Amino acid sequence: MAATTSKIDDSMPARISSDCPEEIREVLYYAWGHDRSGLKKLLKTTGKATAQDPKTGETPLHAAIRACGPASPDDDGQEEDGSVEEAKDIVHDLFLQGAIWNDVDSNNETPGCLALRLGRKSLYQLCIEAGVRAELLFALMGDYEELSSGSEDGDEEMEVQQDDDEEAPQLVSTEDVEPTVEEPKFIPPDAKEKQVTSEEYLNSKLVYDDAKLVDSDLNGVMMAWETDIMRRSVAALIPDSAPGKRILNIGFGMGIVDGMFAELKPSRHHIIEAHPSVLEHLSKDESKFGPSWEKSGPEEGAFKVHKGKWQDIVPKLLEDGEIYDAIYFDTFGEDYSQLRYFFSECIIGIMDQEGKFSFFNGLGADRKICYDVYTKVVEMQCADAGLDVEWEESDVDMSGLEKAGEGEWEGVRRRYWTLDSKSFEGAAVLRYAVGTSNRL
């Protein structure tokens, strides 16, 4: 989450530390001064665009943006002052030389977070565009690595052999080697924050109460405050509330969205859930989606909880010829690559031509720049997968969600939604995608 504005000193002495290494200080000064010609000379050296003050984490991107200062309250963003125009050139050059769009400083702000806080909309937009380019490139590189790794039919690796009569290299005494002194490096504020993986999540013990579902590390898996968001998602998936729809939900959690789907009297309602604690909860007699619910379907197998990972279950549904009118995706502990794999590789085989797909969009929801970047990335990659995407926005009532450890977040380790109303210049907004097939 980006820092608040009240305690941040944006002056140059505060951001470029007195003991910052000379070669880093130099590039920061040039970026701060918007000296394009001088900076270009420095950027010829590899790594200069990504340099960071080891104490403050200031990067050349931060420096170029911070030097503009805050925008005037009556600035509508249509006419920007000369310093912003100069900064745009510097930011462009830095991104061209490999500057990282989401590096954070000691305030836990990315360059985009800083531009947003200062009200510099055009600079913020440049950061979004750079983030989108970077994420799309990483996705392409990941696809390439997946295709090329483990190939047994490709070129064999070249083996280097040493002739028996070749003289062996002499051993070098460790006393003759001068130890290298590592330059101090900036440590991000959240460097020690534990990241949740799917494997760790599935092996953890979950605890239910009326307001939330948390894992053994107190990560919020699902919370009651999401109810209104899910209600809007259901309305978008089935806008006429028509009965008889074929529904697939991936990730049961607290059963919020499944309860809403059930009220619409679907003809088929399938749930995929992998976590043992959730499955145990579902198996109880008092569960609304337990054995008695499965038996209440219009035909055998119409209402069913599929136990296991969706990566294993979906191929079986495809083999069985299952087709759905509405598909909702809300897993936990998985990164974006898994969501992308689902809508790129799986949707086409199990969704009706007139069907709709949606997911809980918490991608980067603890930082607006990340949220905006992933909104564009998802839209572009859904289009590549043959899905027409329409984003709908839902106001989020932030009462009780403002502070970590308080209100709705009491008993939860970290807030996974932190975008307040200031982030959107109005009510807090959650975007959710509704994808429909554009394939003939």
From Swiss-Prot:
Monomer. GO terms for biological process: methylation. The keyword Glycoprotein does not apply. The gene is RMT2. One of its GO terms (molecular function) is protein arginine N5-methyltransferase activity. Its EC number is 2.1.1.-. SUPFAM superfamilies: Ankyrin repeat, S-adenosyl-L-methionine-dependent methyltransferases. S-adenosyl-L-methionine-dependent protein-arginine N-methyltransferase that methylates the delta-nitrogen atom of arginine residues to form N5-methylarginine (type IV) in target proteins. Monomethylates ribosomal protein L12. The keyword Ribonucleoprotein does not apply. It comes from Gibberella zeae (strain ATCC MYA-4620 / CBS 123657 / FGSC 9075 / NRRL 31084 / PH-1). Its main location: cytoplasm. PROSITE patterns: SAM_RMT2 (PS51559). Residues 182-194 have a biased composition (Basic and acidic residues). Residues 152-168 have a biased composition (Acidic residues). Keywords: Cytoplasm, Methyltransferase, Nucleus, S-adenosyl-L-methionine, Transferase. This is Protein arginine N-methyltransferase 2. GO terms for cellular component: cytoplasm; nucleus. It is an enzyme of class 2 (transferase). It comes from the Eukaryota. InterPro entries: Ankyrin_rpt-contain_sf (IPR036770), Arginine_N-MeTrfase_2 (IPR017408), RMT2/GAMT_Mtase (IPR051038), RMT2_dom (IPR026480), SAM-dependent_MTases_sf (IPR029063). S-adenosyl-L-methionine binds at Y201, M230, F252, G253, M254, G255, I256, V257, E273, A274, H275, W310, Q311, D330. Belongs to the class I-like SAM-binding methyltransferase superfamily. RMT2 methyltransferase family. Disulfide bonds: none annotated. Residues 192-440 form the RMT2 domain. Residues 147-194 are annotated as: Disordered.
